[in-house]
């Protein structure tokens, strides 16, 4: 969760087995380096769903994804007002 006033992400850690319900985001560049910004929702064994920014994960069996490559370049830049890496087309 990103706190705009603090300009800081507050990470949550979820442990145990989960199934991916949704995974969406972008892979682009910041200052010429690859940068991913992913959001994930995942359900535990009882069906409770948790979610947020995906910083790291370990896949135990499979992870099916569709990746769409677009023509052109999308970069990001650091916005000083919000502290976020915003799109630059």
Located regions from the model:
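N-terminal intrinsically disordered, cationic/polar leader segments
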Residues: 1-36, 41-89
């Amino acid at each position: 969760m990103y706190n705009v006033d603090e300009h800081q992400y507050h990470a949550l850690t979820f442990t145990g087995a989960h199934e991916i319900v949704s995974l969406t985001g972008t892979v682009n560049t910041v200052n010429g380096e690859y940068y991913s910004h992913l959001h994930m929702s995942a359900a535990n064994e009882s069906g409770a769903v948790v979610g947020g920014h995906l910083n790291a994960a370990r896949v135990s069996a499979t992870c099916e994804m569709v990746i769409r490559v677009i023509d052109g370049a999308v970069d990001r830049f650091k916005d000083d007002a919000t502290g976020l890496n915003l799109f630059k087309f």
